Design a protein with these regions (language model features):
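Surface-exposed loop/turn motifs in large extracellular/passenger domains
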Residues: 1-210
C-alpha cells in the first residue's frame, strides 16, 4: 500500500508482504516507505488509524533517500509503515535499510516497525536488522529497533525485538547554526534499541518488552 489518505479512524488488517520494497528515486521531501504501507495518515491525535495483525517478510530499502540539493523535508521508513498509526500485533522479519546519496532530509526516521510513533503499540515484533547507512549529511536522524521517532505520548506493551540496530550516517553541515524550531537537536544522530529519539516533554510508558 502506498500513501493512504482515505480518512480517519480506519483499519489496515491481516495483510502480508513477502516481496522486497525499494525506493530508488526520491523527491526532495516527504519520502515514505514501508513493508505494508508507506503512510497511514495516522498523525491525528484524536482519530488515529490502525495497522493490525500485519506481517512483512520483505526487505525495505531506501537507496536514494533524497536528492543532493535537498536541504528540507522528511524521510520516514519502517518494516511495517513509514509513518505512524496505532500498531497492534504486527511483525517484521525484513531488513530495513537506508543507504545512498544526498545531503538528506531535515528529518530522517527509520524503525523496524515504523519510522514514527505517535500512538500506542501492542504486541509488535521486529526480527529484521535496522540499518541507517546513508553515510551523508542529514540534519536529524532517528534510528530505532521498533520506532524511529516518537512525537506524542504513547505506550509500548508486549513488544519484542531481536535484531541489530546500527546508524553510521553523518550529520555535519550548518550544525553550529542550529534552528529556531529545534536548536538543541540540530546536527544530531540518535539510535536506540526501542525508539531512536523521543521528543522532549512527552509521556512514555514501556510495559513487557523483550
Amino acid at each position: 500500500l502506498g500513501r493512504l489518505d482515505i480518512g480517519k479512524g480506519y483499519v489496515v488488517e491481516d495483510c502480508r508482504n513477502e516481496a522486497p520494497v525499494t525506493l530508488a528515486t526520491a523527491q526532495a521531501a516527504n519520502n515514505l516507505l514501508g513493508g505494508i504501507a508507506a503512510y497511514a495518515n495516522g498523525e491525528n491525535r484524536d482519530t488515529p488509524n490502525t495497522i493490525r495483525n500485519c506481517e512483512n517478510r520483505g526487505d525495505v530499502l531506501a537507496d536514494a533517500p533524497v536528492s543532493d540539493k535537498a536541504k528540507t523535508g522528511q524521510a520516514r521508513m519502517g518494516g511495517i509503515c513509514g509513518g505512524t498509526a496505532v500498531f497492534e500485533g504486527n511483525t517484521n522479519y525484513g531488513k530495513v535499510e537506508a543507504r545512498g546519496g544526498g545531503k538528506g532530509a531535515s528529518e530522517f526516521s527509520i524503525g523496524g516497525i515504523s519510522g514514527m510513533i505517535a500512538h500506542d503499540a501492542t504486541g509488535c515484533r521486529n526480527f529484521g536488522d535496522v540499518l541507517n547507512n546513508t553515510g551523508r549529511e542529514n540534519l536529524l536522524a532517528h534510528t530505532g529497533g521498533l520506532f524511529g521517532w516518537a512525537t506524542l505520548a504513547f505506550t509500548i506493551t508486549d513488544c519484542a525485538l531481536d535484531a541489530d540496530v546500527v546508524s553510521t550516517t553523518l550529520y555535519n553541515y550548518d550544525g553550529d547554526k542550529g534552528t529556531t524550531a529545534d536548536p538543541a537537536h540540530e546536527n544530531s544522530s540518535c539510535a536506540g534499541i526501542l525508539v531512536g529519539r523521543i521528543k522532549s516533554k512527552i509521556e512514555v510508558t514501556v510495559e513487557s518488552v523483550k
